[in-house]
């Protein structure tokens, strides 16, 4: 498993413990006490490092090559998943996957950004950066879900919508804007979960819902830290400083009222234990459905409207104002 820069002390100590255990197997000497001391030291070191992650550390975890994707969570959380393809206008976009599934026996529609696991798959899925047809496919599935009264669950994980010439010619901005407009008025429950990177309008195209949750080490922002640094300081190398200033972590966004709940991650990140991570997401989905249970369609839309009208409201000297 690929290790991140800030994890090196942990990796080195793990390797030392492993080497000592291997040596003990082929030796008459007893190193059990030394191993116990090192394992205790490792526990404390992991607690210190993973319990005090910096913003840039979380950015790296969110981008980890082995971080679970939408399809990974679909496999662990849902049954009878049937993937649907195409937007019925241009083509199919592999950067967004979606279809019909069952969640604990209840029919649902599941949609999400999809990155690749290796170079070949990343090229096929355009590194998780959707074209307009991806967003139109997602909207087609959402309207289908509304027609058949199925709740919608969206998994968000993209650096952003694809900014290429062909995507712009096919109406990238219109496709995203249309999704924002239509999702705001859907008469079925919509749960959105940021599982990795939530980048710019590319994330928002699947991000209008009744509840917005984020995994503990995911990020959600209007632009990547590198992009912000390049604009502000003409130096993408200052991405760490930009990340600190942008308020892109789950904790920051929970405090600002942009998201509703933070879903805990396995120590070291979701990629360390996908079964445990899936359980954590499962618990949050169950809790959210309980909160949405019994709400009428009119009330659902009204509460969704109120939710988004509150975002951006701040207070100075006890006087509320709107940021415009």
Swiss-Prot record:
Residues forming the CoA carboxyltransferase C-terminal domain are 37-291
The reply on keyword Lipid metabolism is: yes
Could you list this entry's UniProt keywords, alphabetically sorted.
ATP-binding, Cytoplasm, Fatty acid biosynthesis, Fatty acid metabolism, Lipid biosynthesis, Lipid metabolism, Nucleotide-binding, Transferase
| Keyword Nucleotide-binding belongs to the record | yes
Report one GO cellular component: acetyl-CoA carboxylase complex
Q: What EC number(s) does its UniProt record assign?
A: 2.1.3.15
Reactions the enzyme catalyzes: N(6)-carboxybiotinyl-L-lysyl-[protein] + acetyl-CoA = N(6)-biotinyl-L-lysyl-[protein] + malonyl-CoA
The record's function comment reads: Component of the acetyl coenzyme A carboxylase (ACC) complex. First, biotin carboxylase catalyzes the carboxylation of biotin on its carrier protein (BCCP) and then the CO(2) group is transferred by the carboxyltransferase to acetyl-CoA to form malonyl-CoA.
Report the sequence similarity comment from the record: Belongs to the AccA family.
From the Swiss-Prot or TrEMBL record, give the protein name: Acetyl-coenzyme A carboxylase carboxyl transferase subunit alpha
What is the species listed in this Swiss-Prot or TrEMBL entry?
Bacillus cereus (strain ATCC 14579 / DSM 31 / CCUG 7414 / JCM 2152 / NBRC 15305 / NCIMB 9373 / NCTC 2599 / NRRL B-3711)
Q: Please spell out the taxonomic lineage of the organism that makes this protein.
A: Bacteria, Bacillati, Bacillota, Bacilli, Bacillales
Give the gene that encodes this protein.
Answer: accA
């Amino acid at each position: 498993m690929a290790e991140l820069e800030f994890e090196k002390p942990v990796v080195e100590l793990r390797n030392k413990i492993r080497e000592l255990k291997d040596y003990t197997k082929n030796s008459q000497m007893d190193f059990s006490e030394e191993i116990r001391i090192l394992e205790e030291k490792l526990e404390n070191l992991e607690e210190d490092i993973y319990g005090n992650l910096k913003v840039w550390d979380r950015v790296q975890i969110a981008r980890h090559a082995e971080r679970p994707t939408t399809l990974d969570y679909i496999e662990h959380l849902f049954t009878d998943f049937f993937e649907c393809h195409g937007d019925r206008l241009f083509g199919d976009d592999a950067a967004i996957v979606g279809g019909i599934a069952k969640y604990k026996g209840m029919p649902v529609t599941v949609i999400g950004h999809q990155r690749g696991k290796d170079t070949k798959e990343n090229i096929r899925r355009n590194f998780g950066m959707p074209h307009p047809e991806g967003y139109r496919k997602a909207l087609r599935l959402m309207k289908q879900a509304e027609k058949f009264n199925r709740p919608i669950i969206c998994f968000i994980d993209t650096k952003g919508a694809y900014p290429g010439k062909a995507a712009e010619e096919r109406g990238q901005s219109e496709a995203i804007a249309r999704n924002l407009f239509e999702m705001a008025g859907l008469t079925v429950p919509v749960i959105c979960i940021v599982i990795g990177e939530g980048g710019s309008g590319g994330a928002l195209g699947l991000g209008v819902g009744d509840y917005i949750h984020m995994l503990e080490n995911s990020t959600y922002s209007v632009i990547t830290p590198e992009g912000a640094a390049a604009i502000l300081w003409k130096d993408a190398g200052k991405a760490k400083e930009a990340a600190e200033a942008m308020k892109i972590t789950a904790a920051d966004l929970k405090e600002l009222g942009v998201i509703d709940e933070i879903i805990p991650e396995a120590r070291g990140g979701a990629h360390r234990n996908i079964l445990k991570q899936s359980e954590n997401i499962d618990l949050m989905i169950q809790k959210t459905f309980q909160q949405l249970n019994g709400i009428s369609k009119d009330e659902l839309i009204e509460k969704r409207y109120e939710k988004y009208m509150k975002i951006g409201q701040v207070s100075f000297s006890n006087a509320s104002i709107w940021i415009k």
